Amino acid sequence: MSNPVVVEAWRGRRVESAHRGAGAVIDAGGAVVTAFGDIDRPVYPRSAVKALQALPLIESGAADQLRLGAAEIALACASHSGEGTHVATARAMLARVGRNEGALECGAHWPLGERASRALARVGAVPSALHNNCSGKHAGFICFACAQGLDPEGYVAPDHPVQREVASAIANVTEAGLDNETRAIEGCSIPTYAIPLRALAYGFARFGAGQGLEPARARAAARIRAAVAANPAMIAGPGRFDTEVMTILGPRAFTKSGAEGVFCAALPELGLGLAVKADDGAGRAAQTMIAALLDRLGGFDEGLRARLAPFVRPRLLNWRGIEVGALRPAGPLA
């Protein structure tokens, strides 16, 4: 069975392109609130689960031991734009355990933020691992390892104690089985595990509400949510979906993008978790899907919905800034 068309790209009065996908909204008790497409097919959540990957850093006491602030905790969950503040914060996290960028095993790439990339190129510099959008997460892994008295070298390997703790946290929160059959390698070299959308949404419902989690894990989840709500610019960057939407909605929503058209979110006040996947891996489709679900289910007042509207139906502009069309939720999201 094919997944339904969930987002259409309109140009003028016609549909120019269409994206198929699947999505689930689950409550903290595991009940399906709404679903479309195949929500039981395992997908790689990629960066959408970075907040879950940061749980051991908090609940182990490492964050307190190293006196990590809210901005640093937020960066540990980020797919950041490589702005100066992102790079400086990741560097400061490493310095707390006597390390530098040479300890990072995520690889280097040009900053996701155009402004940051241009700034580097302007002075003839090349990007380092600190500019990798995952450097905050990796700095968090290194901080966790050092605080636990572990050698951080090789921390990206599946059998390293850091990744064993991370996998255990994800499995606990989502109640998904993670094993060698579901494991692959992330773009930043750590393990990634294929998990059904149903389990991802359930996990984010529990992450948002704390329901069903051990008290220490629930407190860690709440601390991560609060850190990101207070520092939305750290989770992504200017003009990017997660930063802009969480700036609008504050602690009422937690959203996190992942590569290849995956998106997860939580509505903590409502005890709901959301997970979507665009079949073709299109980030624009996943963003529109999540925005449509937030708008439909969030219970926001008209003022907030008006501010969210540009993300529910994003305008398509040409190179002169002329509006030529829009993305629109379709099918089960229309």
What are the language-model segments listed below?
Residues 1-40:
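Beta-lactamase-like hydrolase cores
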Residues 18-23, 139, 167, 260-263:
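Short glycine-rich loop/turn motifs
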Residues 50-54, 200, 271:
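Residue-level preference for non-acidic, small/hydrophobic
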